[in-house]
């Protein structure tokens, strides 16, 4: 198990810069990639690669790869396993603040609200067309690139809809969860994301 407050993992081809944050099953760090030289966000799973949650992490990588070419979805650059056996994702780095932090300072103006909403709605539509239900759309998961373009991030609890759907649904963010998830409904569908959006 990786101690997210301990030293960062050693990842070949990358230099550690700082810890960005930690969640339930992963920690996100800022690294500098050696080739090509750029700053990237590296999401490292806290559990070892043999742990059963490793498949959840692999699923997130594969789901993001299916849709990350959309301009309003966080780009994934690669994935691997660190020297100490922890799976990781290499992603586009979006400097703070994310939408949740911005909204705590006050509301966006009408033009910013419409622009952000339209772009994120396009990202959600793209995910749905690929058969992916995000399941965790909330202000904290809407980041802004260096050029102030909003991007949807964190596909960690996403699920497939339609024939590829899994019976196992994990987690939710209660304030943005649709009513059917709050009453224990086990299926994921696009309407859930629309409600959260």
Task: Describe the predicted segments one by one.
Residues 17-23, 28:
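Protein kinase glycine-rich loop
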Residues 32-39:
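Conserved N-lobe loop of protein kinases adjacent to the ATP-binding glycine-rich P-loop
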Residues 84-98, 102:
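Conserved short submotifs of the Hanks-type protein kinase catalytic core
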Residues 122-132:
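Protein kinase catalytic-loop region centered on the HRD/HxD motif
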Residues 46-67:
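AlphaC helix of the eukaryotic protein kinase fold
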Residues 75-87:
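Short beta-strand micro-motifs within the conserved protein kinase catalytic domain, predominantly
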Residues 116-117:
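Activation segment signature within eukaryotic-like protein kinase domains
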């Amino acid at each position: 198990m990786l101690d997210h407050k301990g030293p960062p993992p050693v990842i070949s081809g990358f230099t550690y810069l700082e810890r960005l944050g930690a969640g339930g099953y992963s920690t996100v760090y800022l690294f500098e990639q050696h080739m090509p030289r750029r700053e990237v966000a590296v999401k490292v799973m806290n559990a070892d690669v043999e742990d059963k949650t490793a498949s959840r992490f692999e699923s997130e990588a594969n789901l993001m790869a299916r849709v990350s070419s959309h301009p309003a979805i966080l780009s994934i650059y690669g994935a691997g396993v660190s020297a100490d056996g922890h799976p990781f994702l290499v992603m586009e780095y979006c400097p703070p603040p994310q939408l949740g932090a911005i909204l705590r300072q006050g509301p966006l103006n009408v033009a910013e609200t419409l622009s952000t909403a339209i772009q994120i709605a396009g990202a959600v539509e793209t995910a749905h067309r690929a058969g992916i239900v995000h399941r965790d759309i909330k202000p904290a998961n809407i980041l802004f690139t260096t050029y102030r373009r909003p991007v949807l991030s964190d596909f960690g609890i996403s699920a497939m809809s339609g024939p590829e759907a899994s019976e196992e649904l994990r987690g939710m963010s209660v304030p943005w969860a649709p009513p059917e998830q709050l009453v224990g409904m086990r299926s994921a569908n696009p309407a859930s994301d629309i409600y959260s959006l």
